[in-house]
């Protein structure tokens, strides 16, 4: 109540001042002095930190893109939530990052090789190795609670900063399936698959590099869409429930084929200490 009264008082003072000075040439300094006089502008206080507890790090700590989508559109909502992770290989291949766009819808082997070179150069900056580069690696193994990068069968190295290793996934034969790195609280997933079309042609069998992308999403009910009547609200809450339970899906026609979109599965990894 006190804050509302203060707000009303300041608004009335602003209205009266603007009426009184209507048509006059007013300097920025005059305006600033008046705003300070009525308490609209106050002196900067000491540095402080927000102390709200139990807030997910994606909201409180991690700096990254945030998407806004209408909750009433299940397909858009799923796209936004799934955009937490995005393929760097796909992003570089399908855009003009390399200087030009793809010339056709068919896979271009030479362009693909340039994409791999570009991405490994990115890894050299994101998670540099000791005394070598990512394009020299022929194998990545988990040995004695460490991630070892092999240059040859008898020569190996590690990351310059091994604290960048968030964790990994193993195949049933104990070879690495996925290596998860991080920098500035954002993660990078290096996928390894010797049977993948890209992976089998790569020295280290790296099939893709996935970057943490849209860290969070606003599922919007009132700006990009207006859920005001009962029918719209039922759709909104049904989609929200589907996201919370993990069973939301959307079917649509693409290239004359029915496509179904669902939530990506959670990612489970092992840390170096198990």
Identify the residue ranges that each predicted region occupies.
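Catalytic alpha/beta active-site cores
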Residues: 33, 37-274
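N-terminal-proximal low-complexity accessory segments that begin disordered
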Residues: 1-25, 29-42, 50
């Amino acid at each position: 109540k006190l804050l509302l009264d203060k707000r009303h008082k300041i608004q009335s003072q602003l209205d009266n001042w603007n009426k009184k000075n209507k048509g006059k040439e007013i300097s920025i300094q005059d305006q600033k002095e008046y705003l300070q006089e009525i308490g609209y502008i106050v002196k900067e206080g000491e540095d402080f930190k927000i102390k709200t507890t139990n807030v997910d790090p994606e909201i409180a700590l991690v700096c990254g893109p945030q998407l806004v989508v209408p909750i009433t559109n299940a397909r858009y909502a799923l796209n936004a939530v799934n955009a937490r992770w995005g393929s760097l290989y796909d992003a570089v291949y399908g855009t003009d990052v390399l200087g030009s766009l793809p010339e056709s819808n068919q896979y271009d082997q030479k362009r693909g090789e340039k994409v791999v070179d570009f991405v490994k150069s990115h890894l050299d900056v994101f998670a540099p190795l000791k005394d070598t580069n990512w394009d020299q690696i022929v194998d990545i193994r988990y040995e004695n609670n460490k991630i070892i990068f092999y240059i040859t069968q008898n020569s190996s190295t590690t990351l310059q900063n091994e604290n960048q290793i968030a964790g990994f996934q193993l195949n049933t034969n104990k070879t690495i399936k996925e290596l998860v790195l991080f920098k500035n609280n954002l993660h990078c997933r290096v996928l390894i698959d010797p049977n993948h079309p890209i992976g089998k042609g790569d020295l280290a069998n790296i099939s893709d590099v996935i970057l943490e992308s849209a860290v969070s999403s606003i599922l919007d009910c009132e700006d990009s869409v207006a859920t005001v009547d009962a029918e719209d609200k039922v759709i909104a809450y049904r989609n929200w429930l589907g996201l919370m339970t993990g069973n939301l899906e959307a079917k649509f026609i693409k290239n004359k084929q029915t496509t179904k979109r669902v939530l990506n599965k959670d990612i489970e990894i092992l840390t170096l200490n198990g």
